Amino acid sequence: MIVGIGTDLAEVARFEQLLARHGQRVARRMLAAAELDEFARAADPARFLAKRFAAKEAFAKAAGTGVRAPVLLPAIAVTHDELGKPAFACSAVLHDWLTARGVQRMHVSISDERTHCLAFVVFEG
């Protein structure tokens, strides 16, 4: 059964501006520790952040809370399997919170074009 759906669209230029204005501090506020190494190697840091932000915002919408404790951006890591399929890894606190609300599986799709990144998230129970 579907227990939550969320989608988000992020403009890459917005993240270019954020990086120009605030530097690496933006990444440290948005990314989980596991994502920071991948960000450091990213060929296009603004696009990397835009994709992660869209996925995390869509996650927060599927959770039905928006971004507020325990659904915080650094508590959500966007990972991928060996074929590149995106997935989520959550902090222990967030994982327990989701489990208590009946979320058993999470699905995420991320797409990007030159100017925008889009993410769609489904929570199953």
From Swiss-Prot:
Entry keyword set: Cytoplasm, Fatty acid biosynthesis, Fatty acid metabolism, Lipid biosynthesis, Lipid metabolism, Magnesium, Metal-binding, Transferase
GO annotation, cellular component aspect: cytoplasm
Residues involved in Mg(2+) binding: D8, E57
Keyword Lipid biosynthesis: yes
One GO MF term attached to the UniProt entry: holo-[acyl-carrier-protein] synthase activity
Gene3D superfamilies from the UniProt entry: 4'-phosphopantetheinyl transferase domain
Enzyme class: transferase
A single GO BP: fatty acid biosynthetic process
Cofactor (UniProt): Mg(2+)
EC nos: 2.7.8.7
Localization (cell): Cytoplasm
Catalytic activity field: apo-[ACP] + CoA = holo-[ACP] + adenosine 3',5'-bisphosphate + H(+)
Entry's family note: Belongs to the P-Pant transferase superfamily. AcpS family.
The protein's role, per its UniProt record: Transfers the 4'-phosphopantetheine moiety from coenzyme A to a Ser of acyl-carrier-protein.
Name this polypeptide is given: Holo-[acyl-carrier-protein] synthase
Gene: acpS
